[in-house]
Amino acid sequence: MAFRIEHLADCPEHLARVAAWQHTEFGYLNPSIRLEQREERLRASLSATGLPLTLVAVSDDGDPIGAATLLPRTITHPHLTPWLSTVVVPPACRGQGIASALSLRIALEAARLGFPMVYLFTPHNASLYRRAGWETVEMAELNGAPVTIMVRSTSV
């Protein structure tokens, strides 16, 4: 499947769908966050000039098929910055390199903003990120769920 990666600021019509995907995929990690709050957080990334920054993978037909956000910090490790967050690809679109392409583009965006490294945590996709050049930093817990903290250089 052919796709391009755009800043959410350039395709804000996809904001509600991306928020719904994030809520469905990651809501269990922080159940107190409502869908409306996710939408509000995404609205903060409608400027492509700094953080937060959200990227959307868009098919040639114009449909969103994945998204990822670059955040300045995370609740578990506020001393590390920035963070690749909420990478989500709908089940029907998985296995086509979309998540890997999004994570690479996030690293490039972090480099553009002057960051030498970018971090992430993942509850269940560490092997996918290892194949894309990420290294494990440590194992941690987020609201009782085990997560892998990973890092990669932004010089790709």
Where are these regions (language model features)?
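Conserved active-site alpha-helix within GNAT-family acetyltransferase domains
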Residues: R112, P116, P123-P146
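Conserved hydrophobic beta-strand within the GNAT/NAT acetyltransferase core sheet
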Residues: V87, V118-L120
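Conserved N-terminal entry element of GNAT/NAT acetyltransferase domains
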Residues: M1-R17, V156
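Hydrophobic alpha-helical core bundles mediating ligand binding, dimerization, or RNAP-core interactions
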Residues: L15-F26
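Active-site rim helix/loop that mediates acceptor-substrate recognition in acyltransferases
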Residues: F26-S59, T69
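Conserved acetyl-CoA-binding loop-helix of GNAT-fold acetyltransferases
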Residues: T86-V89, G95-L108
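Short hydrophobic/aromatic beta-strand or adjacent loop that forms the aromatic wall/cage
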Residues: P52, A145-M150
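Conserved beta-strand in the GNAT
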Residues: T54-V56, D63-P72, T81-W83, V88
